[in-house]
């Protein structure tokens, strides 16, 4: 099995905290859709650990950004149809669309989503459309003053209305994103955000501590003393409140920043943490073949459009993996290679398995560590974990039926240690 990630690098405006690759140049959208579909089609013969990409069962498709909901319905349909035509997408695949509150009004008809009866006119319009069955809504906070501060385009009433519209359209798998530790945000404001979020009948919640990334507007404001970072004590209190409320509402804390009702874990994100191969399409998108090779697409939107709008021979996509700077395509100079490849060492693969495993409630699969990296590496991991086990920062889950010298199946973080997880991960890595 494998997953597909589609990067839509367009935003109507840039948020104050965002450092993801995106642009506000809407005039490039049409050309981008053409180039994107070319990349999707050209890469169908890539070799993944599970087999040739076009023959592997695709279990998740994820539209991220940027803001995928800035595209027209017809443009999203073209991209989805291209994916389904070139890859074996499972009938029950999870297909997620990231969306901003308010975009539903102008973007999608209800028939875009599964489970909604449509009129004959709508049905004819939607022939061939591959349905989205999960929406991830970027709300961030329900406080209007904080929304203005971080330069979000919507207000709280728009966010609430969008959730209601999605539910009315038959979408029964809705995730929302929240941010805590915003400048000036109090614990009472955060408690209000959580109260509203859990009252909406959503199935999934992702909540992240605000990060001041270099080059962002918020980072500049902090350096100019216009805003101040939340202190550690407040951040810990907010995270503790998040975990408590989620538990009360019956949400499973299945990853450090992710909470879901039973049966609604994000299958796409879970595949990343489990080391499943995935194909990433679009500028700055990353891919992993399931063996040891990572691919990173050139982040330049202009060069991406130039390259994928001009090549015809699918084999060229492979031959140009390490194309030198200054190569030309369609008689135009391309300053950088369209993508780069990285072969991960055993140590890097081990470190990634540790980091991804510890982020989840299940923890590190010790049988997998022994199978992939050997008994010696497993013993080294358990030795490095020993001080944290004694201090109850790590927990060993045991099962006598499993043939491991330690009789343990998984090594996981104690919930009380999540706030120092980075330090613990560092101790366990090679």
What spans do the regions from the language model cover?
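Short amphipathic alpha-helical interaction segments
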Residues: 375-388
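A short, conserved structural fragment
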Residues: 390-404
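C-terminal scaffold of the Radical SAM
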Residues: 1-3, 22-46, 56-325, 329-375
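Local cysteine-cluster metal-coordination motifs and their immediate loop/turn environment
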Residues: 9-20
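Minor-groove-contacting beta-hairpin "wing" of winged helix-turn-helix DNA-binding domains
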Residues: 404-405, 409-414
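Short, amphipathic alpha-helical interaction segments positioned at domain boundaries
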Residues: 415-430
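Short active-site neighborhood of thiol/selenol oxidoreductases, capturing the structured segment around
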Residues: 5-7
């Amino acid at each position: 099995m494998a997953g597909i990630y589609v990067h839509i690098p367009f935003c109507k405006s840039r948020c104050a905290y965002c450092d993801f690759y995106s642009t506000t140049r809407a005039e490039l959208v049409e050309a981008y859709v053409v180039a994107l579909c070319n990349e999707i089609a050209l890469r169908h013969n890539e070799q993944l650990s599970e087999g040739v990409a076009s023959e592997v069962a695709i279990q998740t498709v994820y539209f991220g950004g940027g803001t995928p909901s800035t595209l027209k319905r017809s443009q999203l349909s073209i991209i989805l149809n291209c994916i389904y035509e070139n890859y074996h997408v499972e009938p029950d695949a999870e297909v997620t669309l990231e969306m901003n509150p308010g975009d539903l009004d102008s973007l999608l008809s209800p028939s875009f989503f599964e489970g909604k009866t449509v009129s004959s006119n709508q049905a004819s319009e939607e022939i061939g459309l591959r349905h989205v069955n999960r929406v991830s809504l970027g709300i961030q906070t329900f406080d209007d003053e904080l929304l203005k501060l971080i330069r979000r385009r919507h207000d709280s009433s728009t966010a609430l209305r969008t959730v209601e519209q999605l539910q009315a359209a038959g979408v029964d798998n809705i995730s929302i994103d929240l941010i805590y530790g915003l400048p000036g945000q109090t614990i009472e404001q955060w408690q209000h955000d959580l109260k509203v979020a859990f009252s909406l009948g959503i199935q999934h919640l992702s909540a992240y501590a605000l990060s001041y990334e270099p080059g962002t507007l918020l980072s500049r404001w902090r350096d100019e003393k216009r805003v101040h970072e939340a202190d550690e004590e407040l951040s810990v209190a907010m995270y503790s409140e998040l975990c408590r409320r989620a538990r009360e509402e019956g949400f499973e804390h299945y990853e450090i920043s992710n909470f879901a009702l039973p049966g609604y874990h994000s299958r796409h994100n879970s595949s990343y943490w489990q080391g499943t191969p995935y194909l990433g399409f679009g500028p700055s998108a990353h891919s992993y073949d399931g063996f040891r090779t990572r691919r990173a697409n050139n982040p330049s939107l202009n060069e991406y459009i130039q390259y994928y709008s001009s090549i015809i021979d699918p084999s060229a996509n492979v031959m140009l993996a390490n194309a030198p700077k200054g190569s030309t395509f369609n008689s135009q100079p391309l300053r950088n290679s369209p993508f780069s490849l990285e072969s991960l060492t055993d140590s890097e693969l081990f470190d990634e398995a540790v980091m991804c495993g510890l982020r989840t409630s299940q923890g590190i699969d010790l049988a997998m560590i022994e199978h992939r990296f050997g008994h010696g590496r497993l013993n080294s991991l358990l030795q490095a974990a020993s001080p944290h086990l004694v201090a109850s920062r790590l927990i060993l889950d045991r099962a006598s039926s499993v043939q491991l010298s330690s009789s343990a199946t998984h090594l996981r973080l104690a919930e009380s240690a999540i706030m120092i997880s980075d330090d613990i991960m560092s101790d366990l890595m090679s």
